[in-house]
Amino acid sequence: MSQPGRVDKQPGYILHTQPYRETSLLLEVLSRDHGRFSLVARSARRPRSDLRGVLLPFQPLTLSWFGKGELRTLHAADWDGGVRALTGLPLVCGFYLNELMMKLTARDDPEPRAFSVYDRAVRELAGGAPLSTALRRYELRLAQVLGYAPALSRDSRGEAIAADRHYLCRDAALPEPDEHPELAPVGRVVRLPGEALLALDADDYREPATRGHARLLSRVWLSALLGDEPLASRQLLQAIQSLSD
């Protein structure tokens, strides 16, 4: 008879680990089809455990587990390979990916697109992509796929974004046509050219100006979504957002 709530061979990543009881680990995982939740890896801290070299952050895994409720039990884990271990600044950026994912997602709320956004960001960091590009893409796209922020193809009036116009991006709302370009934006708002919004909507970060505009937009969106103290280290967020290619 199969175990209750058993799931086999599900793509996933480990977001956080901590010791659990004498020899086990408590894992916070992000799975493709089941969202974010907690798993117990029994005896994973024993010296001869096969899991010791597998349960690593920022590595694509295939996870199997059983059980229901808030805490499930890991049955098996396999390393999918193909991703270089993160070190140095990419590793710090990886911790930021994890913290932002845990802040913006609810447990047991599956969103396969969020998993894809995370997977792409990890692979970009491991593959030597420009760090600021990888992070800005992750921030903006994650907010969009989770339903917190809009697509950037249309404005607040429902009209197509025009490349030759400027728009006010306020909080995480649709861009508003800028009717008063002579006035400086006030509050949690940034003025951006339509050309930049269209580039971001097309996932085109090739131009340095576009990457700079992405940084401004991500600051506005994350400030609206996370509040005044969004992360354990506010300085870490500020340092990462100041990166430039």
Swiss-Prot record:
Per the record, the GO terms for biological process are: DNA recombination; double-strand break repair
Which Pfam family would be a valid example here?
A: RecO_C
* Keyword line: DNA damage, DNA recombination, DNA repair
Under HAMAP family, the record lists: RecO
Q: What does the UniProt function comment say about this protein?
A: Involved in DNA repair and RecF pathway recombination.
Q: Give the UniProt family note.
A: Belongs to the RecO family.
Stated name of the protein? DNA repair protein RecO
- Source organism of the structure: Chromobacterium violaceum (strain ATCC 12472 / DSM 30191 / JCM 1249 / CCUG 213 / NBRC 12614 / NCIMB 9131 / NCTC 9757 / MK)
The lineage, from the top, is:
Bacteria, Pseudomonadati, Pseudomonadota, Betaproteobacteria, Neisseriales
Gene it is expressed from: recO
